[in-house]
Amino acid sequence: MRKLSFLDRVVEEIDSYARFTKHPLNPNRKSPSANTVDGQLSDNDKKHAAGLMRVDYTGEICAQGLYRGQASVAKSAQTKEHLYHAADEEYDHLAWCAERLEELGAKPSLLNPFWYWASFGIGATAGSISDSLSYGFVVETEKQVMKHLDSHLKNLPVNDNRSREILKQMYLDESEHAVEAQKAGGKKLPKPVKAIMKLQSKVMTTLAYRF
């Protein structure tokens, strides 16, 4: 099997990015909201729900970038496979959020290309150091995503049942990813690194909610 050159890998990643940002997306799993009906939602309810779901969509874009960046330089085939599998599950989340945004009459954040490639760079940097550090980033990323999801579940409009079902399943999946990464040997990240990740996350959520 021919070994991919650096240029081949760049083209492959650009193609992958184009694939999972081209709508409509085709998830491997049916949306958790498929059999759920919303209650009455006002225009303000829809606007607020759309802002939260846009943040969650962008969070999944970041996770895709991080995982694919890590996988591109992973030391072992097992780690590479693990990360690509996690990215595939995150693809379902992207599709669910994209569908819900469309239902709410909204679009994904305009800044998603920046967040994806920034996350890809962070992932590739961490992955080039060691697989254990790479897994450590997965654990911390999933923990932060779970905090966002928990907050959004509490702040969604009361009658937004469809968004709620999506976020509940996403929370379960993210929790599983964190546990798997920890079992795979995830290294605890230094406090300064965690602080930077939290700051980046705060900036992302603030901007993505608005546009």
Curated annotation (Swiss-Prot):
Cofactor(s) needed for function: Fe cation
Q: Is Cell membrane one of the keywords UniProt gives this record? A: yes
Q: How is the cofactor bound?
A: Binds 2 iron ions per subunit.
Q: How does it sit in the membrane?
A: Peripheral membrane protein
Main localization category: membrane
Q: In what ranges is there compositional bias, type Polar residues?
A: 28-42
Give the domain of life.
Answer: Bacteria
Sequence positions that bind Fe cation 2? E90, E142, E174, H177
Fetch the Pfam families from UniProt. COQ7
Report if keyword Cell inner membrane is assigned: no
Binding annotation for Fe cation 1: E60, E90, H93, E174
Spell out the InterPro entries in the cross-references. COQ7_proteobact, Ferritin-like, Ferritin-like_SF, Ubq_synth_Coq7
Q: Where in the cell is it found?
A: Cell membrane
Name the Gene3D superfamilies on file.
Answer: 1.20.1260.10
| Alphabetical GO biological process terms | ubiquinone biosynthetic process
Q: What does this protein do?
A: Catalyzes the hydroxylation of 2-nonaprenyl-3-methyl-6-methoxy-1,4-benzoquinol during ubiquinone biosynthesis.
Task: Describe the family membership recorded for this protein in Swiss-Prot or TrEMBL.
Answer: Belongs to the COQ7 family.
What this protein is called in its record is: 3-demethoxyubiquinol 3-hydroxylase
Organism, by scientific name, is Francisella philomiragia subsp. philomiragia (strain ATCC 25017 / CCUG 19701 / FSC 153 / O#319-036)
